[in-house]
Amino acid sequence: MNILRASQLNNGGNMSNNTNNNMNSNMNGNMNNLNNRNVGNNRNIGNTRDVSNNIDTGRLQINVTSAITSFPVADATISISYTGVPDATLEQLRTNSSGQTETIELDAPPVELSLNPNNEIQPYSEYTLNVTAPGFEPISISGTEILANETALQHITMNPSEPDETGEEVFVIPGHTLYEEYPPKIPEPEIKPVRETGEIVLSRVVVPEFIVVHDGTPNDTTARNYYVRYRDYIKNVASSEIYATWPANTIRANVLAIMSFTLNRVYTEWYRNQGYDFTITSSTAFDHKWIPERNIYTNISLIVDELFSNYLSRPNVRQPILTQYCDGNRVSCPGWMTQWGSKALGDQGYSAIEILRYFYGDNMYINTAEEISGIPSSWPGYVLSQGSTGDKVRQVQEQLAVISGAYPAIPRVTADGVYGPATAEAVREFQSVFGLPETGTIDYRTWYKISEIYVGVSRIAELV
């Protein structure tokens, strides 16, 4: 793994001291000008500091994989610049054998800005990433969002290059829903009637492996459909709808609402029953905001991995509840959860279910899906660790052996059904590569992450 600072770049990428100083001066000046507006009106953020001259930092890690094989892309080069100054490189990173860069720190606006519902200043900084790799088409992502004190994860998929092709794929990430203006949600009944003859409805609640996202309004025939892994979709939506700086239980409550809404669309086949060929849209007027190639955040990712098989229920109702919400500041929505209101309750120590019941009523419950699609075997219900034995251990060892073929940093282990030090080390390295707590034990999150990566890697291997 290599990381080149701006001052170390070779010919063609050098940044002079004057350029560096000018950029720092410009950013400081812009922050000062922005922060001098309306800071005096900030409230509900506790004991605050003076943010008018303050710049915080956030963190960024980049993961690069092949769009065809899902294997990591080693030795990819990523040049990072401010989105507003795209030609002046701040950092240049290279991916390791796992397709990952080092985690770096980048300037971000003060954390207080993302904690105040009355703030009018953009609370995140935006960066442009230009990515190249031998044998792949270059890709540019403009608008990666860095929040103070949080780690942003930017997943990038690269297409193999074709002969005589010199084009660059470009993604421009629009602003966050809590900062930019988006259409408010059109109200719908939270429980969908299922009466029409021939209507497609699932017999039980199933967590899908993939969903089809229509990147526009339902009737926009020019919008593209994307096949997205369910968990990746939820992480993307949560990162687009709320700020990762918010309390953990606030994030959990919002993730549960997002998942229940989404699983209602899956369970009722809402759009397919209207003749469409997708599961859900990216329009805030109809569904949630989902953005192709946007970054997510480590804490949101871990919470989704913790909760992804859950949804919200009411007594004697089989389908997941269509839990609608709004920001609660620019838009009001009686009877729905408000995002800023959920943040205030999280600040007061409310649990996730307490937050949800505050908005949706006391008869709202957290339920678990009967089936998770696309996995070889369900979670055994207990943590696997050194000393564990049996078929579940052997199964994980076999899966890790397959995964290590694509991710050589993960040591290959013998599938003997005994969870010894070698297995613990392989699990620990797997957790390091995929952003999980490095415990060396297999809990719920690690079990399903191993299953997800194994299915992706082995499915491609079968096709080769």
Where in the sequence are the language-model features?
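Short, acidic Ser/Thr/Gly-rich low-complexity loop/linker segments typical of extracellular
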Residues: 85-115
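Structural motif
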Residues: 55-57, 61-74, 83-85
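Conserved, single-site charged/polar hotspot
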Residues: 1-55, 75-77, 94, 100-106, ...
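Short consensus segments that form the blades of beta-propeller domains
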Residues: 53, 69, 118-120
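Short loop/turn segments at connectors of secondary-structure elements within structured domains
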Residues: 56, 72-74, 89, 125, ...
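Short, solvent-exposed loop/turn segments that connect beta-strands within catalytic domains
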Residues: 84-88, 122, 405-409
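A short, solvent-exposed loop/turn motif at the edges and junctions
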Residues: 111-142
